[in-house]
Amino acid sequence: TDGAGNISWTTASSGALEEITEGSNTGYRIVGRDTANYGDIGVNAVDLSYSLVASTTNGATGRSSTAMGYETKASDNFDTAMGIGTAASGRSSTAMGNNTEATGFTSTAMGENTDATGDVSTAMGTNTDAIGEASTAMGAGTDASGLVSTAMGAGTDASGDFSTAMGSFTVASGEASTAMGESTFATGNFSITMGRYSAAYGDNSAAMGYFTEASGDVSTAMGDSTVASGDVSTAMGEVTEASGDVSTAMGSYTEAPSLAETAIGSFNTPYTPVGVSSWNSGDRLFVIGNGQSSNSKSDAMIVYKDGSTIINGALTLSNGSDSITLPNTDGTSGQVLGTDGAGNISWTTASSGAL
């Protein structure tokens, strides 16, 4: 039209769209494009892409699809492909950026070299893969292969169904597991790990901190280099180990190897229990370690499962206003305990004729 109501035939200018019919489908493509470099236009498709090489797949070939950029492909119904070398082949999928591919139904791939293959999946960033249905992979080199899984950060892997891996090189392979931080592993079902180089191997286990390990089911390891290997065990502090079932090790370099044993303090003495997962009256129930190093291990107090107790050191009993201190050494034959009236009790030789 000349703007005055006069309409006449004219040559379309470069860059304008023209209606074309190919293979019984009618859509729209930029004027002047070499048809040998494109697949047949899709019904109501809009092809704004540019292709220099012969192809039967480039462009907007799906129904109501849109292709933009260089060597892009929108091949299924309602697809959108934008950028360089992107391909949207899943129905209602979107591929944007550089060499991205969206093959899953209503999937989205954005960034560089990303792949969204699962239905309703999303891959964003660089070299990410969203393989599982409804999965999400974001960042650099992340993989989300589990159902409804999420991988975020750098080099993370969420392979368990409903799992989440976040941070740097974390792995969440257990069902509904969560791995966060750097190089952490959550392999147990419903497990969680946080921090650096920590691992939660047991089902329903939790490992937090630095180099911690929770390998027992329903176990918890926290702190620095702690290990909770017994079922329902807890290890906290520094280099503590709870290997008995339902055991607890807290403090520094403490060990709780028997069932329901609790060890606190530092560097308690080691022993071999009879029952790791069963009750034995000769095993320890509670121990307070007061050792100073791995070469100087000792115990301030030991309570055994039969109730017998060993106290290494003086024992002071107090009612708040008065107190007495019992000696921690044995007397000689014939000696008795005596008091000086000030709360100090010691071994003394009984006077002649005393009862």
Predicted region positions:
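Periodic small-residue-enriched repeat registers in elongated scaffold domains
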Residues: G15-N312
